[in-house]
């Protein structure tokens, strides 16, 4: 009986090691995965991928209407524009380290593809998980929060299109909502729609002009821009994939700080119907 218990324990340890060391399911698979297959692997933060040999084209008919579905944007690199210590130098983008590792991908975005008079296409974003709250850390230790988003994106291609292929690029602008909501209260209890009007050590200085920006909170909507370059096309399934580069402002602490300029690069996937 003693040996049987040892054998059972040994087999349990071996099974645990095999489970822990086994490869996670490939993110490019189109099969439906279970929760247990996804949990702890990071696949929920990955966009589907097309094979390297996908170099076809998707024919377009201007008399028909098209929809772009399942648009997924997976960031891979983050950069923040830093002002130099020397005024003679120009501001440069500095690479940042992602702190919110498993919650950075925009997914399931959909919208209409409309033909224009010059045979270009315009994509208008309508719905989807179109924002993610992200924080990156700069080499000096500073942490920069921002709302990675493509809300209300309107992007246009070059004119004279008869198909979607690897030469097609989308460029457009979008809205960047406030990182914090209007009901958020800062550590001193100040907010946009609730909280104190001011919170300073000396009440007589509450209306000081130097403190107005900190005391008067604002949930501002700013602007961003993005470009998407198609690199892979599967004409049989209507799938496209490629790379993107987005530029947008960072969090402003409800208007108390100047926004930093953030650049995001990564890969995208979508399906045309």
From Swiss-Prot:
Any Pfam family: MSP
Name of the protein described by the UniProt record: Photosystem II extrinsic protein O
Disulfide bridge positions per record: none
Annotated organism of origin: Nostoc sp. (strain PCC 7120 / SAG 25.82 / UTEX 2576)
Subunit and partners: PSII is composed of 1 copy each of membrane proteins PsbA, PsbB, PsbC, PsbD, PsbE, PsbF, PsbH, PsbI, PsbJ, PsbK, PsbL, PsbM, PsbT, PsbX, PsbY, PsbZ, Psb30/Ycf12, peripheral proteins PsbO, CyanoQ (PsbQ), PsbU, PsbV and a large number of cofactors. It forms dimeric complexes.
MF annotations from Gene Ontology: oxygen evolving activity
UniProt keyword terms in alphabetical order: Manganese, Membrane, Photosynthesis, Photosystem II, Signal, Thylakoid
Signal peptide, first to last residue: 1-26
Gene3D superfamilies on file: photosynthetic oxygen evolving center domain, Photosystem II, cytochrome c-550 precursor
Main location (coarse class): membrane
